[in-house]
Design a protein with these regions (language model features):
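ADP-ribose/adenylate-binding Rossmann-like module
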Residues: 95, 100-111
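A hydrophobic C-terminal alpha-helical subdomain
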Residues: 246-319
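Short, amphipathic alpha-helical "lid/cap" segments that border enzyme active or binding sites
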Residues: 68, 188-196, 298-306
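N-terminal Rossmann-like NAD(P) cofactor-binding module of classical short-chain dehydrogenase/reductase
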Residues: 71, 75-80, 105
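Conserved Rossmann-fold cofactor-binding substructure of NAD(P)-dependent oxidoreductases
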Residues: 55-74
Length: 319
């Protein structure tokens, strides 16, 4: 794509701005101010919570006409829809292509779905189907796509809401497969900055996977940082719960046979993908340098832990 075309990429539509990931993407665009942002919402009941200068359009995700109308004139579609709404993304992609949207960034922001083991997990079937749809649609149109993989979202994983690694209320830290394996992890703020950076590097990020991380760290290293942050708070010592991700996957498969994608099913496959060796959770290559993502060190991770453990941090993650 020529440079003069990239300079004309200005109008961005964001779906899912009220969710946790979407709220951080929204914040990044508000800080950036180089792009004109439009929010796609199911209803306008919480419109007062959005910045007044941002356009908000109510859409019907079951109506192609509604989606195409909302996306006309948009250069970029960013989806931050949560797992409960992932089935809507196929219609969003069809509408974006019909509206001649130049770049489509779907709701990924997680596991490395280029890993063949992780790619087989049934909980990622909708995302993989959408990736295939994007590849086909963009090959036959003027649209392009970017898939953003972040592996484990650090603030979510250590929050009371996520509880993937830490259960703060029980003073419990979960160690998967011994806890010595390094895994890639990314903060929610960096997810937002990455989306903006992808548009700033429009040509270099077209029709490809982007992998970013704030740090590659072991769970044991993270546990030590949690202990340092909480050392003076007067609380009890941290307990450790050892979990085998192979067992978690087995339990997820057994639960899946009962016919429902329950939280236990999602959890079992998620921890296997994020923390088990050989499942792509420790990125072999990252695109941080291309996008200007600097990453964070021990002190910054400790500041993040301190914030997430605070009342303000818990409230920010309560979407």
């Amino acid at each position: 794509m020529k440079e003069d075309l990239r300079s004309r990429i200005k109008n961005v539509a964001l779906a899912g701005a009220t969710g946790i990931v979407g709220s951080y993407i929204l914040a990044a665009f508000c800080q950036n101010k180089r792009y004109n942002l439009t929010l796609l919402v199911r209803d306008k009941s919480n419109i007062a919570s959005f910045p007044p200068h941002i356009t908000v359009i109510q859409v019907d995700y079951d109506s192609n006409e509604s989606l195409v109308s909302a996306l006309r004139g948009q250069d970029v579609l960013v989806s931050a829809l949560g797992k409960a709404a992932l089935h809507c993304q196929g219609r969003l992609v069809d509408a974006a292509v019909a509206a001649n949207v130049r770049r489509i960034i779907p709701s990924e922001f997680g596991a490395n779905l280029r890993n063949p083991k992780t790619r087989k997990f049934p909980t990622y079937a909708l995302k993989i189907s959408l990736e295939n749809q994007l590849a086909r649609s963009c090959e036959l149109s003027n649209s392009s796509y970017t898939l953003i993989y972040t592996n484990c979202l650090l603030d979510w994983a250590i929050s009371s809401r996520g509880a993937l690694l830490v259960d703060q209320s029980k003073r419990l830290f979960k160690l998967y497969d011994g806890g010595n394996n390094k895994f890639s992890t990314t903060s929610l703020a960096t997810v937002g900055h990455t989306v903006v950076a992808v548009l700033d590097h429009f040509e270099a990020t077209a029709n490809r996977v982007i992998c970013v991380q704030d740090a590659a760290i072991s769970q044991i290293e993270l546990l030590e940082l949690v202990k340092e942050v909480t050392a003076g708070d007067g609380g009890q010592e941290w307990d450790v719960l050892h979990i085998d991700t192979g067992d978690a996957e087995t339990r997820a498969l057994a639960a899946l046979k009962q016919g429902a994608l329950t939280s236990e099913v999602f959890y079992g496959f998620a921890v296997r993908a994020a923390f088990a060796p050989g499942y792509g959770g420790h990125f072999a290559h990252c695109d941080n340098e291309l996008l200007g993502i600097k990453g964070i060190g021990r002190d910054e991770i400790k500041r993040l832990i301190r914030h997430v453990f605070s009342e303000d941090g818990q409230q920010a993650l309560s979407h």
